[in-house]
Design a protein with these regions (language model features):
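N-terminal amphipathic, basic helical "cap/leader" segment at the start of enzyme domains
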Residues: 1-101, 106, 115-117, 257, ...
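Conserved beta-strand/loop scaffold segments within soluble protein domains that form the structured core
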Residues: 31, 79-337, 351-380
Length: 380
């Protein structure tokens, strides 16, 4: 028996246990499971996964849990599954489509209050969850959305979010991941953006034993996209962020800032790709990845990438890896601040500009409290 067959056998048993559903949904499920069966789980021999070993997910036997949401409406058919990448984890999520959070914001509507979705895996020990979110924002509509992932015990969340934005829309998307320290989390976010759309994504990764975030956006003419990310890993956590900004049309602008804080024996990966297509002249794109490493055993692998096929563009990228500044530590301690507290203050200061970019005040304040508490436990 091949490795792929061994991995997919247990999933086939779970797949066939699902209740029958609408024919069009079943067709999506069947096609997705066939794709997953052919692909199998990625391995470290795959370039996109060379620093992240998903064997603990692939080898485990998971029972399927029902996730929050509502039955899939017919009107979701136009976009569901049309935007997420066709990789193994996205296929696996689609194969277990059951309920969905489907959000439609009509043309010109301005939603003043954020739309909040909580995927709570409390009590899901030993289970697999496949949350699915589809957000369709009409032309010139405005909305903010917050997705929160949390839970207790050892479980596997495999989430997919697709965002479709009409011309001139404004979307702020927030993903707050503070899963159980024993949990596995694979999340895919893919946004397809219309002309002159303004899109921002804020990814905060705090929990999970093994985490992979894939965030991508395809830009049209005059689109502005911003990707902000903060990942904090300690003990033996592993957090992998892969991002793709695809400038498909001219006059697009993108800004990306991802920051990581690593302690203990933690590992992290950042792979950020900016693609500028041949027709995407006058593109302006900047990508930055900064990492703060607090221990000798923590490891970060960072790889910013530019793929430029146009000639009239302005694109920059860079990555840094550093430690706490010794002079700043000395300055704080010379003013009577204990070493542990000084370390905590400087660590928070490193993360603060990401937190400050969060426009929803209650969410920003909640994260500030969460980070203060987390950094209080940073070892001196």
């Amino acid at each position: 028996m091949t490795a792929v067959a061994e991995q997919t056998g247990a999933w086939l048993a779970e797949f066939t246990r699902q209740e029958t559903t609408e024919p069009w949904i079943q067709a999506l499920r069947d096609a997705a499971f066939e794709r997953f069966s052919k692909l199998g789980f990625p391995t470290t021999r795959d370039e996109e996964w060379r620093f992240t070993n998903v064997a603990p997910i692939a080898r485990a036997s998971w029972k399927t849990a029902q996730v929050s949401g509502r039955p899939i409406p017919q009107e979701a058919l136009q976009h569901l599954g049309k935007h997420a990448p066709e990789n193994a984890f996205s296929a696996l999520n689609t194969a277990f489509l059951d309920r969905i959070h489907f959000v439609e914001v009509p043309r010109g509507q301005v939603r003043e209050e954020p739309i909040e979705i909580v995927y709570d895996a409390t009590g899901a020990d030993g289970q697999h969850l496949a949350p699915r979110t589809l957000i369709v924002v009409g032309p010139h509509a405005h909305c903010s959305m917050v997705e929160t992932y949390r839970g207790t015990g050892k479980y596997f969340t495999n989430a997919v979010t697709e965002i479709v934005a009409g011309d001139g829309a404004v979307i702020d998307h927030y993903k707050i991941q503070h899963e159980s320290p024993e949990a596995y989390h694979v999340g895919t976010l893919q946004a397809t953006l219309g002309r002159s759309t303004n899109f921002s994504s804020h990814s905060i990764s705090l929990g999970g034993a093994l985490v992979r975030n894939d965030a991508g956006a395809t830009l049209s003419e005059g689109t502005e996209a911003t990707l902000n990310g903060l990942y904090i890993a300690d003990d033996s956590q592993h957090i992998d962020n892969h991002t793709t900004l695809d400038h498909a049309k001219p006059h697009g602008t993108s800004h990306e800032l991802y920051k990581g804080i690593l302690d203990g024996r933690a590992g992290a990966v950042f792979n950020g790709r900016i693609i500028v297509r041949k027709d995407a002249q006058k593109t302006d794109s900047k990508q930055t990845n900064k990492n703060l490493v607090l221990s000798n055993e923590a490891v970060i692998n960072t790889k910013p990438e530019l793929q430029i096929l146009a000639d009239d563009v302005r694109c920059t990228h860079g990555a840094t890896i550093g430690q706490l500044d010794a002079e700043s530590m000395f300055y704080l301690q010379s003013r009577g601040i204990p070493k542990r507290e000084a370390r905590s203050l400087l660590t928070y200061a490193f993360a603060q500009d990401i937190i400050d970019r969060i426009k929803i005040q209650p969410l920003r304040e909640s994260l500030e409290r969460m980070l203060f508490e987390k950094f209080r436990s940073v070892k001196p």
